[in-house]
A protein has these predicted regions:
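Bacterial N-terminal signal peptides that target proteins for export
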Residues: 1-7
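Kelch-like beta-propeller repeat domains
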Residues: 15-365
Length: 365
């Protein structure tokens, strides 16, 4: 009888605690520390290669201390090793895996401004080679692989514009050349660019003269930009991800107050209606996020950076869930890369003092 009463009391206490915290976040997956990179990096790029390894390129140790170096993460051994160096040290560049298996690295900051230079990494040789230059200098631009294998590059900052620019161009993978195309309706830096199911690209938010609530669609058939519905909240340095039903999640970022205007709000874009609607909020306000939220299990998107907590958006419940475990600090401009086995590599970033970390973590669903 005594054992029964103890068990009953334990159950009652548990129910009372649950009732007292009805909004306590559920846990989804776990974050654990992993082997460090060879160099501390932030604002670098991380690209999953066809062989399952991850190319980490460029970035910075601290302000004005930029890298040419690159390294490879092997998910089998869990370790990093060196590979060929880029021709130009750069930070805030774009990196896109091409259908050929090569990686296009374009633009970025080079210390005294931005660059229009571009190079290709060949995993079979481990070397970077310079390719044709972009038509415009740009740093912190967006780059999206189109259905035809070409790459759309939009916005970013150049030497002369304090905010973003509105120019755009296409990298033709076959000829390895860049072509200037029509301008966006709004200048943007630190926007998101998401490929939709129908082949169009949603470009949302970013900063021009001010932080944008506007969004537009790029149509590869006409090579034109078309305005669409506006975000509910103007934001930049946010993240975005495609959901299984074809809608797009937009989350976090900041308003014009930057560090003091970090956002926890999220919204969803519906290509059928061309409108944004409010979604559940993140548990933590965060900005300076990876542009693309990492897809994990069907209907789930991982959001890391800007907080010690890692969150998962669950499209079935429409809520953000908190993973167990934490990263070591509030790292900004870190990377998150989905691996072939369903895990996600989280790497680098910098805290408030601008000194990057070499730390990495693995998210296990």
């Amino acid at each position: 009888m005594t054992l029964f009463r103890f068990a009953l009391a334990f159950l009652v206490l548990g129910l009372v605690a649950l009732a007292a915290h009805p909004d306590r976040p559920s846990q989804a997956g776990r974050v654990t520390p992993a082997a460090p990179m060879l160099e501390p990096r932030s604002s670098h790029s991380a690209t999953l290669l066809p062989n399952g390894q991850v190319l980490i390129a460029g970035g910075m140790r601290r302000n004005q201390d930029f890298y040419r170096s690159a390294e490879l993460y092997d998910p089998v051994t869990g370790k990093f090793r060196t590979t060929g160096a880029m021709n130009i040290a750069r930070v805030g560049h774009t990196a896109v895996l091409l259908r050929s298996g090569k990686v296009l690295i374009a633009g970025g900051w080079i210390g005294h401004g931005t660059t229009n230079s571009a190079e290709l990494y060949d995993p079979t040789t481990g070397k970077f080679t310079l390719t044709a230059a972009m038509t415009h200098r740009r740093g912190h631009a967006s780059a999206t692989l189109l259905d035809n294998g070409d790459v759309l590059i939009t916005g970013g900052a150049d030497h002369d514009t304090p905010g973003g620019i509105n120019s755009a161009e296409i990298f033709h993978a076959g000829s390895q050349t860049f072509e200037a195309i029509g301008t966006m309706h709004d200048a943007r830096i630190a926007q998101t660019s998401t490929l939709l199911r129908d082949g169009r690209v949603l470009i949302a938010g970013g900063r021009g003269d001010s932080v944008n609530a506007s969004a537009e669609l790029y149509d590869p058939k006409t090579k034109r930009f078309i305005p669409t519905g506006s975000l509910l909240t103007a934001r930049y340095k946010h993240t975005a991800g495609l959901l299984p039903d074809g809608r797009v999640l937009i989350a976090g970022g900041s308003d014009a107050r930057d560090w003091h205007g970090q956002l926890s709000s999220a919204e969803i874009y519906d290509p059928q209606t061309g409108r944004f609607t409010a979604a559940a909020s993140l548990h933590d306000a965060r900005f300076k996020l990876p542009e693309d939220a990492a897809p994990i299990r069907p209907g789930e998107l991982l959001i890391a950076g800007g907080s010690k907590q890692v969150e998962v958006y669950d499209a079935r419940s429409g809520k953000f869930l908190v993973a167990s475990g934490q990263i070591s600090d509030v790292w900004h401009f870190m990377t998150e890369t989905p691996l072939r086995d369903g895990r996600v590599l989280l790497a680098g970033g910098y805290p408030d003092d601008d000194h990057a970390t070499a730390d990495t973590w693995i998210y296990q669903p």
